[in-house]
Amino acid sequence: MVNRRSFLKYLGWSGAAVTAAAPVALANTNPAPNVPATITGRVLGNGKGIANVAVTDGYSVVVTDKNGQYSLPAAAAAEFVYISLPAGYAVPHERGVAQFYQPITAKNGGFTADFKLEKLAVDDRKHQFVVWADTQIISKKDGEQLKAQSAPDLRDLVASYPKGSLFHGIGCGDLVWDHFELYADYKEAIGMTGMPFFNVIGNHDLDLDARSDDYSARTFKQQFGPTYYSFNRGQVHYVMLDDVFFIGTAKKYIGYLTENQLHWLEQDLKLVKPGTTVVVSLHIPTQTGHKRRENLKEEELGGSVSNRKQLYEMLKPFNAHIMSGHTHVNEKWEEGSVMEHVHGTVCGAWWTGPICSDGTPSGYAVYEVDGGEIRWYYKSTGKPREHQLRLYEKGRVKTASEYMAVNVWNWDPKWKLEWLEDGVVKGTPEQRVSHDPWAVELYAGPDLPKKHKFVDPTMTDHLFFFQPSASAKKITVRATDRFGGVYSETMTLA
């Protein structure tokens, strides 16, 4: 039996393949222009030039002049010319996929690319975005579930906000599970939500027949454009990065940001005022609690970003949030001015059950932006917004038979938890590293779950324990998030 920890290691936390190695590509099958080209054009809003818009080929960055014109000396290896969408304009999209780029088809050393935008009728300093991590569909059946459950849930969430509210989505990698024909289902799903999606490449979005990392994203690029880019909405600057570095065999990869990206990011961030809120999205987290929770001797190379310190250094002048997925668990981390949100999955436990391996419900995160301030909550698929914790009766956790337990999946250290007996506050539940008992029931053992037997429950930091009094008849756990939102769950004891 391969348990989940072993499977994740096998899958690429430290790298090896689940399936047989694909044939090695002996040549570049997606050739980029082989001569430098000068790219010129205009960025227009309602027919008028827009000044100070960043334009890039992924190597160098220029800005438009007062007439919206630019001239960009593109690198020989550049594949796209694209803009950092300016604040105040609608996001162009096709079937939900944001359109901010054009493939470079240089002729005689020159290429022209114009970008036409429409001015928003509303102030975008207030807007919302959602993070869909690891939709990870491997079959048409998974794709149908995505379209029948997840997409309508998100569409209904948008409808619950005031009419005209601005939303965009972030597809945080592993959009599919190696089966690229299912991108059509993913696109259909995001198209159903009514919002533009900006997409990040994950390890299961890689071309496994590539001979090196340079060519491992050719299918993703055909579907979604460049793998690293930025855009602006309101007072927030958004950055998407590719941190999955393919090492050229089977499914082996590490979490790593290439020098090309870091050099581009330096240029991009020079155009952003210090103190600005910057949201960086990537697939592999920059850090996790996996090593500590599982008592590992060292971090697994495919489980976090090896050169994260360099990224943190670049983000120091800003109020930075990092959005990631990959681990199929939900957790939060803060270091200096950087806060990382590692997201639970849209697919739950690879579409085998309603929760992730740490007990987090299948779902997504919702972020509400007002100026430079961001508030957030977790939205469980098929559940109301208020569903933020799950209470377990005494003995449900077999290793703590005299205790009740509560899973608060979006917890961070600024939350406040308390338990009440018959309406009287008794104390604060104790945080322990443990397994969610429902995840144990669904996924533990060699025969569970039937669909993907590699799935196992994983240790989590967001499980809390308390010992109720023998006389207690009604137990309530009350959780207050860092923004003052209060959630509770009550259980009547026999």
What positions do the PLM features span?
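Binuclear metal-dependent phosphoesterase catalytic core
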Residues: 338-422, 456-490
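Short, acidic Ser/Thr/Gly-rich low-complexity loop/linker segments typical of extracellular
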Residues: 59-73
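Beta-strand-rich domain onsets/edges
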Residues: 24-38
